[in-house]
A protein has these predicted regions:
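Catalytic cores of enzymes
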Residues: 1-246
Length: 246
């Protein structure tokens, strides 16, 4: 990896009315990274990206950290066409499963929730949807890490699964680390920190994830709900080369 964009510790209080209407208003649930349990702060996502940032810098990897008010949809869109080899997003994620005949619309119903600094702008409402991601040029990005709930979910259509993973693959990303269910905020931070420790020690993405999951099981998070949701898509393949600039 040569450069990374890291999003976490996002300021959800800035989000638009549109976003607030989508997620629940029940703030008494546990700290899971989806909209189902309320639109609450995720304090460990800030720890997570700070840990990742420090680990990558140790390896002299150039990082851009987007936290608080700066973790907006507009900032993510600005990665369009940039040669960023790693993108990490720690936030709320969710999806609405549609019927198979509605699969063409499913990409509009799988999303990540970003900070709402530009919520008044039509195209930057705080919801980063799969259909929007699919229009970007993220070729050359070796891996996207989606540290949020349900980021590997979607609607099954005739041409496969329609969700965030399809959005990022259409954008040209090679490997995706995603989740198949809700994930715990603190456990996710621990897993991701260990995952990157393993990466910088020389392990492959797949080996790094297996070791990180094992670490959780052996350190107070034996229940599969804490570590099993995380899976890799297309790990170990070569990235699509980013077009050279003339």
């Amino acid at each position: 990896y040569s450069s990374a964009a890291l999003f976490g510790g996002l300021d959800y209080e800035m989000a638009s009315t549109k976003v607030r209407n989508i997620v629940s208003t029940d703030h008494n649930s546990g700290k899971f990274r989806n909209g189902q349990n309320g639109y609450h702060e995720l304090p460990y996502t800030l720890n997570e990206v700070n840990n990742v940032n420090s680990l990558l810098k140790e390896k002299k990897i150039k990082t851009n950290l987007f936290v608080g008010e700066n973790g907006t949809e507009k900032q993510f869109r600005a990665l369009d066409g940039k040669a960023v080899s790693l993108i990490h997003i720690a936030t709320h994620g969710d999806y609405k499963e549609l019927k198979q005949r509605e699969a063409d619309d499913a990409m509009k119903h799988c999303f990540l929730i970003m900070s709402g600094a530009n919520a008044t702008e039509e195209n930057n409402d705080g919801l980063l949807r799969a259909d929007e991601i699919s229009t970007l040029n993220l070729r050359g990005c070796r891996m996207v890490v989606l540290s949020a709930c349900n980021t590997g979910q979607g609607t099954l259509g005739a041409d496969g699964l329609f969700g965030l993973q399809r959005g990022f693959k259409n954008a040209g990303v090679q490997t995706i680390l995603m989740t198949l269910s809700a994930v715990d905020d603190q456990a996710s931070m621990l897993l991701m920190t260990k995952f990157y420790e393993n990466i910088i020690s020389g392990l492959s993405e797949r080996q790094a994830l297996i070791k990180a999951q094992q670490y959780l099981r052996e350190n107070g998070y034996a229940d599969s709900k804490y570590w099993a949701p995380f899976i890799l898509l297309d790990a170990g393949k070569s990235p699509i080369p980013h077009p050279s600039k003339s």
